Structures are given as structure tokens and as C-alpha cells.
Amino acid sequence: MQATWIAPLPLFLELGVEGDDPVGFPFPESSASSNGIPSYTLFARLGGDIGTSSSYRVGAWWLSSENDLSSGAPFLDFSDFYTLQGGDTRLWGLDFIFKWAPEGNPSERSLKLQAEWMQRRIDGNLTFDDGVNPAVTGPIKVTQDGWYVQGVYQFIPQWRGGLRYDRLSNGSYDVSSDLAGLLAAPDYAPYRWSTMLDWSPSEFSRIRLQYNYDRTQQSLANNEVFLQYIMSLGAHGAHKF
């Protein structure tokens, strides 16, 4: 369920609120059978034109949901030993988009720059049980942030090249004294470089070649190559900004 309001101003200003029942990231788990709306989102977007060739949009958002986790905590390395109960997950961030095309016509050349920063906080009661020693339970608060920046440039009609970098911080824990000696401090900040080249033979199809240098796993570097064919069939919605 979502409600939005666009202000009657010379600039584009949109305010919105949304309620939902999330599944998966960024929430450990949510109960689909629970009453009410367990997840809430607030967002604001502001944008406008810069001359006849450029435009921009900036945004801010905040999201909150209740935790309902029955298995291991996903943010801990040895998750089989840990269970999180109760508490909330909160996520907020800032985003920015800049677009350029000669006289506003993107058919020949265009540039799109995009960036986003976000932070996630999880709190609740954590239980450590390795099956050998007595179980220990105490409050925990986890904080982690991440960001990405990317650019896509259309240098001739139908052909584009792009570059992207995304990164997560190693995060931090704030726990009770009972759990302090049982949790190892996170010491790795995953990141990834991506570059791509694509060709669009029509408005509804695209062929993309992409390479990733992926360091999202500690002590392991992955060199990944993808070849994609993307095709759209039938009616499609309005173009996004």
C-alpha cells in the first residue's frame, strides 16, 4: 500500500509513505501471517532541470520493520550458533541522479550518473548456543552502511558503456557484556568493480557484456564475465527518471 503527493511547485517535489510485508534483505525475516503492516517506508524526492541539457533528482528515504527471525542471524559469520529474537530493523539512505543529453535529446548521446548511500541498523535479543556450553542471551545492536556510484554513457546511438563501484563497510556490534567475548569484531569491507558495454538493436531488446572484479568474499577475488540478452514483450509501463 502506497500513497504519494506531488507538490504544485516549479520544481519536482514528491513525498510518499508505504506499508508492506517484506521478505528477505534488508530484514532478517518477517512474518507474513502477522496482523497489521510490519514494514513502513517514508521517502522524499526533489528534482528539476539545469538548462536545456541536464536534469537532476535527489532523494531521502527511511524504512523500518519488525524482526521475526526463527533461524540464524544473517549478519554473523557463524550464524548456526546465533538466533535473533524481537527488535527492529531500520534502513535509511540518500540517493542522487544526474542526466545529460544535448538539448535534452538522448537519441545521439547521453550520460547518466547515479549514487546512493544507505545504513542499516538491527537490534534485538541475541542468543548464542553452540550446543556445548550454556546458552547466553543479551541485547545486540548491529550497524552497517554501504554505497555505490555508477555512470552510463551513450557515445553513439544504440551503444552504451558503463562503470560501477559498490562497497559495504565492515559494520559494528554493540552488545551486552555477556556476549562481548563471544562475537568476533568484523574486519572485512566487501567491494566490487563492474564495467559493461551494451547494444540496443531496438527499444525492447538489449545485448550486454559485463565484467565484475568481485571482492565480496574475504580472501577470495572473483573475475566474472556475463553476456545477457534482455527482451521486453507486450505493454510496458512509463519510463523511469
State the predicted function of each range.
Residues 3, 15-17, 44, 58-60, ...:
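Membrane-embedded beta-strand positions of outer-membrane beta-barrel proteins
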Residues 7, 19-23, 48, 62-68, ...:
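Transmembrane beta-strands of outer-membrane beta-barrel pores
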Residues 186, 190-207:
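C-terminal structured "cap/appendage" subdomains that terminate the fold
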Residues 8-15, 49-58, 101-111, 158, ...:
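Short loop/turn motifs that connect adjacent beta-strands in outer-membrane beta-barrel proteins
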Residues 53-184:
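Detector for outer-membrane/organellar transmembrane beta-barrel domains
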Residues 1-68:
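Aromatic- and glycine-enriched pocket-lining scaffold segments that form the walls
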